[in-house]
Design a protein with these regions (language model features):
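Bacterial N-terminal signal peptides that target proteins for export
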Residues: 1-13
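Short glycine/proline- and acidic residue-enriched helix-loop micro-motifs
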Residues: 148-187
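His/acidic metal-ligating clusters that form di-metal
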Residues: 193, 202-204, 208-217
Length: 268
């Protein structure tokens, strides 16, 4: 999931000098143009919401929604406490538009002492699972496994070549003709990155830290599109985990992925 670019710089010039006419002329140095920075650096703390009722019941939860469990609320509060302990002072905050995201960002911001409210953006919501929404999670994953040529979901997850993007694209194919919208991994990555780009570009006028609460597969798809190393993300993005993204001069750097240290610090 990484790419390398080979940049070759070559410069060639030919100077013709007429000894009779230009012997007395001196060369004038031309200073290279300095590219002006496009703005101040922005650090986005991209976070998954706390555990929900549908999470606890192992039901499929994309565009469907449910409130946080007691554990989910506690994780959101611990996240905020850990961020506050780290001295992070947020300039702005955003969340997806559903109850679980709003509860998480609100509880975390209360702990941080942020004045104001987060901005809701539907582009940050979870991938849509179409006809599988609200259904049994194991049933959906078994269907995906069979679609990809496996006998059952166990074989799918045990395959070292397992790729989440491929699995999500299979889920979208299984929804064809259902009349319900299901998204591919590329579609969810595109909308999430469009939202993050807009947030970062707006904040880059003065720079600073921004808290963004989204959902697990949306975060995973966005990180994959940014070329992040996801080899250590074995069981998906954890509830309350932070992935730190730095936006500078129109380019992204992924600093951390699936980091639970803030939740852990806030639980002490």
């Amino acid at each position: 999931m990484s790419s390398r670019r080979l940049i070759r710089l070559a410069a060639a010039g030919t100077v013709a000098v007429a000894l009779c006419s230009f012997a007395a002329m001196s060369a004038q140095a031309v200073e290279p143009a300095v590219k002006k920075p496009k703005g101040q650096p922005v650090t986005i703390y991209l976070t998954r919401h706390g555990e929900t009722m549908l999470n606890a019941l192992d039901r499929v939860q994309g565009w469907s929604d449910s409130p946080l469990t007691d554990d989910g609320r506690q994780v959101a509060e611990q996240l905020g406490a850990g961020l506050a302990e780290a001295g992070i002072d947020f300039e702005a905050a955003y969340s997806a538009d559903m109850v679980r995201h709003w509860e998480t960002v609100s509880l975390a911001l209360d702990e941080v002492g942020f004045r104001g409210e987060a901005v809701r953006d539907e582009r940050l919501r979870e991938i849509s699972f179409g006809k599988y929404e609200g259904g049994d999670g194991l049933e959906m994953w078994n269907d995906i496994a069979v679609e990809l040529g496996y006998a059952h979901v166990g074989e799918l997850f045990e395959d070292p070549a397992f790729d989440m993007g491929t699995a999500l694209d299979a889920m979208a194919r299984l929804n064809e003709g259902s009349g319900l919208k299901a998204e591919t991994s590329g579609e969810v990555a595109d909308r999430a990155l469009a939202a993050l780009e807009e947030i970062a570009a707006t904040q880059s006028k003065k720079g600073g830290d921004v808290l963004v609460v989204s959902s697990g597969l949306t975060i995973l798809s966005a990180l994959d599109a940014l070329g992040a190393d996801l080899s250590e993300v074995v069981e998906g993005i954890e509830n309350g985990a932070v992935s730190e993204l730095v936006y500078r001069n129109g380019a992204w750097t992924v600093r951390t992925v699936n980091d639970l240290s803030y939740v852990e610090a806030g639980s002490d």
